[in-house]
């Protein structure tokens, strides 16, 4: 495979974002490598997967 990269100038004027999640990467420009890591400190039994969170009784 032959892969040719031509670096040209990049100019960013305005950026609009509607929302960013907790695991987002927003990048403009050159990067040789990106290293991502995360730590999950919540016990698995307290993880809620679904559209509704349980409510405490009044």
From Swiss-Prot:
Keywords: Germination, Sporulation. One of its GO terms (biological process) is sporulation resulting in formation of a cellular spore. InterPro entries: Spore_germination_GerPD_prd (IPR017257). Induction: Expression is sigma K-dependent and negatively regulated by GerE. Required for the formation of functionally normal spores. Could be involved in the establishment of normal spore coat structure and/or permeability, which allows the access of germinants to their receptor. This is Probable spore germination protein GerPD.
């Amino acid at each position: 495979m032959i892969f040719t990269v031509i670096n040209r100038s990049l100019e960013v004027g305005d950026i609009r974002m509607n929302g960013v999640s907790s695991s987002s990467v927003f990048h403009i420009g050159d990067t040789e490598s990106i290293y991502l890591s995360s730590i999950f400190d919540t016990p698995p039994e307290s993880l809620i997967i679904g559209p509704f969170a349980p409510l405490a009784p009044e």
